[in-house]
Amino acid sequence: MYCSDPPHPLHLVASDKQQKDHKLILSWKKPTMDSDPLGVFPNSPKYHPYYSQTTEFGGVIDLGLSLRTIQHEIYHSSGQRYCSNEGYRRKWGYVKVTMDGLVVGRKVCVLDHGSYSTLAHQLEDMFGMQSVSGLRLFQMESEFCLVYRDEEGLWRNAGDVPWNEFIESVERLRITRRNDAVLPF
């Protein structure tokens, strides 16, 4: 059995009082053969969004839904914090990460991490398949290193400054081979 349209079109309407009370009421009108065909469409004057429905047009069901629950709230992930300046801190701390030899970069939220080690773990998950031995960032035997561009436009080695200072100044991240890591780029 295939799904079909409901037998009676449903129209959402809200009166002025309902707007003030933030309540949503679902009402419907059963169309008939002799009724105005425009009467079943939401743009019809009979179904203006502020038209007060009465029981003469059919039943009224109060679903008890608050319009406030339907409004979207701004979502902040657990590690994000509010920054009033600099365009919400460059879209909540997301920075672009590129790796030498790859065309496509990725974005990470540095505010979701509490240290260099958790950032390195996420970058290993994203880019670790590019090397047989993995990235192993911040380890002496690694063939890769992580550098970042700060707010002054200078490229620096990640890990040389405390974490809190790093997340305040990082604008871009780049994974390079150690032997190719000659600054600036």
UniProtKB/Swiss-Prot annotation:
Induction: By auxin. GO terms for molecular function: DNA-binding transcription factor activity. Keywords: Auxin signaling pathway, Nucleus, Repressor, Transcription, Transcription regulation. One of its GO terms (biological process) is auxin-activated signaling pathway. It is found in: Nucleus. PANTHER family: AUXIN-RESPONSIVE PROTEIN IAA17, AUXIN-RESPONSIVE PROTEIN IAA34. The N-terminal half of the protein contains two conserved domains I and II. Domain I includes a slightly degenerated ERF-associated amphiphilic repression (EAR) motif which seems to be involved in the activity of transcriptional repression. Domain II is required for the correct degradation of the protein through the SCF-mediated ubiquitin-proteasome pathway. Interactions between Aux/IAA proteins and auxin response factors (ARFs) occur through their C-terminal dimerization domains III and IV. This is Auxin-responsive protein IAA34. The gene is IAA34.
